[in-house]
Amino acid sequence: MAATVREAIRELMTQTMATMDALLEASDRELTTASSHACAQGKDLWTLITNDIDHEKIHTGQILEARYESRITASRMQRLLAEWLEERARLIGSLIGLTDEQFNRETAPGEWTYRVVAKHVLTLEQDSLKTIAVDQATRPSHG
């Protein structure tokens, strides 16, 4: 694991993409195949993956509890970033399972396509970051 928090987060994000790619390549049928991994508890791939999900939840709780007990409270910006990341994961999760054809269909008659919605979110975020950078550059420095 990386030595710094930022590097560890980047490593976790990179692994998230690798895991997502691997699982998207697998079929639903494969979920019922036997797994030799100890965490599958002698069962199938479904059990292995759901145990991995539960395992992550357990350790997330461990970290949150340790931070609480140690009074390591996130700053407003850190909390904002963590909540934004949760929502980004929900957005990505809502797109998983759509075919490319479905991705380019309207979400409802006369409404934006799924692709346009995703692009809109991305464009708005990029515009917000540009505005933040411009605003920071035009503020008088404190010092």
Tell me what each language-model feature is.
Residues 1-143:
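Aromatic-glycine hotspot motif
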